[in-house]
Amino acid sequence: MNISKPQQRTLHALAQGARIELLRDDHGRIVAAYCITGEGWRLSDCSLAVFKALKKRRFIASSGGGPYRITRDGAVNLRAQVDNRVTARGG
């Protein structure tokens, strides 16, 4: 399945523990979507259009009124990407 680069970046961030939080207007309509990483940074690639596309494909879902997280379908459709994080492993 073809997904755009911003969608890929957003899914990778979600797979690493990020969440998507929504901003609504007075009428309850979604006006903005923000992807917050596990470290608290905001991902610039995540826009309202990216959010709607990922939700339409059911790659993300909200549970119990909480922030949106990656689903099993979203994780399956991720392409392999080198992780930039450096981990210290003893041994």
Swiss-Prot record:
Stretches of the chain forming a coiled coil according to its record: none
HAMAP family associated with the record: UPF0386
Recorded family membership: Belongs to the UPF0386 family.
Name of this protein: UPF0386 protein Caul_4643
Species in which this protein is naturally found: Caulobacter sp. (strain K31)
